Protein backbone atom coordinates (compact mmCIF):
# COMPACT_ATOMS: atom_id res chain seq x y z
CA UNK A 1 0.00 0.00 0.00
CA UNK A 2 2.50 2.63 1.08
CA UNK A 3 6.21 2.86 1.46
CA UNK A 4 7.62 2.66 4.93
CA UNK A 5 8.00 6.25 6.18
CA UNK A 6 11.72 5.61 6.54
CA UNK A 7 11.97 4.89 2.82
CA UNK A 8 12.03 1.10 3.10
CA UNK A 9 10.00 -0.66 0.44
CA UNK A 10 7.36 -2.79 2.14
CA UNK A 11 6.61 -4.67 -1.07
CA UNK A 12 3.25 -3.05 -1.45
CA UNK A 13 1.98 -0.33 -3.77
CA UNK A 14 4.32 2.64 -3.61
CA UNK A 15 2.96 6.00 -2.55
CA UNK A 16 4.45 7.29 -5.81
CA UNK A 17 1.66 5.60 -7.80
CA UNK A 18 -0.64 8.45 -8.82
CA UNK A 19 -3.92 8.26 -6.95
CA UNK A 20 -5.75 8.88 -10.22
CA UNK A 21 -4.50 5.50 -11.49
CA UNK A 22 -5.84 3.52 -8.53
CA UNK A 23 -9.15 1.71 -8.51
CA UNK A 24 -11.55 1.95 -5.61
CA UNK A 25 -10.33 -1.14 -3.78
CA UNK A 26 -6.66 -0.16 -4.09
CA UNK A 27 -7.44 3.36 -2.81
CA UNK A 28 -9.47 2.00 0.09
CA UNK A 29 -6.84 -0.55 1.07
CA UNK A 30 -4.01 1.98 0.91
CA UNK A 31 -6.07 4.49 2.89
CA UNK A 32 -6.65 1.89 5.60
CA UNK A 33 -2.89 1.27 5.75
CA UNK A 34 -2.20 5.02 6.00
CA UNK A 35 -4.65 5.32 8.89
CA UNK A 36 -3.07 2.31 10.61
CA UNK A 37 0.41 3.80 10.31
CA UNK A 38 -0.72 7.19 11.59
CA UNK A 39 -2.59 5.65 14.52
CA UNK A 40 0.40 3.48 15.36
CA UNK A 41 2.46 6.62 15.88
CA UNK A 42 6.20 6.78 16.18
CA UNK A 43 6.64 8.75 12.96
CA UNK A 44 8.41 12.05 12.72
CA UNK A 45 6.39 15.11 11.77
CA UNK A 46 7.40 15.14 8.09
CA UNK A 47 6.58 11.46 7.60
CA UNK A 48 3.25 11.92 9.36
CA UNK A 49 2.38 14.90 7.17
CA UNK A 50 3.31 13.03 3.99
CA UNK A 51 1.11 10.11 5.01
CA UNK A 52 -1.74 12.42 5.98
CA UNK A 53 -1.55 14.23 2.62
CA UNK A 54 -1.57 10.91 0.77
CA UNK A 55 -4.53 9.80 2.88
CA UNK A 56 -6.47 12.93 1.97
CA UNK A 57 -5.82 12.27 -1.73
CA UNK A 58 -6.89 8.65 -1.36
CA UNK A 59 -10.08 9.57 0.51
CA UNK A 60 -11.02 12.07 -2.19
CA UNK A 61 -10.42 9.48 -4.92
CA UNK A 62 -12.54 6.92 -3.04
CA UNK A 63 -15.36 9.46 -2.92
CA UNK A 64 -15.01 10.04 -6.67
CA UNK A 65 -15.25 6.30 -7.33
CA UNK A 66 -18.33 6.01 -5.10
CA UNK A 67 -19.99 9.03 -6.72
CA UNK A 68 -19.41 7.46 -10.13
CA UNK A 69 -20.92 4.18 -8.96
CA UNK A 70 -23.96 5.99 -7.53
CA UNK A 71 -24.43 7.82 -10.82
CA UNK A 72 -24.25 4.58 -12.80
CA UNK A 73 -26.90 3.00 -10.58
CA UNK A 74 -29.12 6.09 -10.90
CA UNK A 75 -28.72 6.07 -14.67
CA UNK A 76 -29.69 2.40 -14.92
CA UNK A 77 -32.69 2.88 -12.64
CA UNK A 78 -33.81 5.96 -14.60
CA UNK A 79 -33.51 3.99 -17.85
CA UNK A 80 -35.56 1.12 -16.41
CA UNK A 81 -38.27 3.53 -15.23
CA UNK A 82 -38.41 5.20 -18.64
CA UNK A 83 -38.83 1.83 -20.38
CA UNK A 84 -41.47 0.62 -17.92
CA UNK A 85 -43.24 3.96 -17.56
From Swiss-Prot:
One of its GO terms (cellular component) is cytosol. Disulfide bonds: none annotated. Its main location: cytoplasm. The keyword Hydrolase applies. It comes from the Bacteria. Its EC number is 3.1.11.6. It catalyses: Exonucleolytic cleavage in either 5'- to 3'- or 3'- to 5'-direction to yield nucleoside 5'-phosphates. GO terms for biological process: DNA catabolic process. The keyword Hydrolase applies. SUPFAM superfamilies: XseB-like. It is found in: Cytoplasm. It is an enzyme of class 3 (hydrolase). GO terms for molecular function: exodeoxyribonuclease VII activity. Pfam families: Exonuc_VII_S. Keywords: Cytoplasm, Exonuclease, Hydrolase, Nuclease. NCBIfam families: PRK00977.1-3, xseB. Bidirectionally degrades single-stranded DNA into large acid-insoluble oligonucleotides, which are then degraded further into small acid-soluble oligonucleotides. Heterooligomer composed of large and small subunits. HAMAP family: Exonuc_7_S. Belongs to the XseB family. This is Exodeoxyribonuclease 7 small subunit.
Amino acid sequence: MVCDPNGDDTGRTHATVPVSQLGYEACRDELMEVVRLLEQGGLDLDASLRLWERGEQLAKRCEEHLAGARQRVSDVLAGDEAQNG
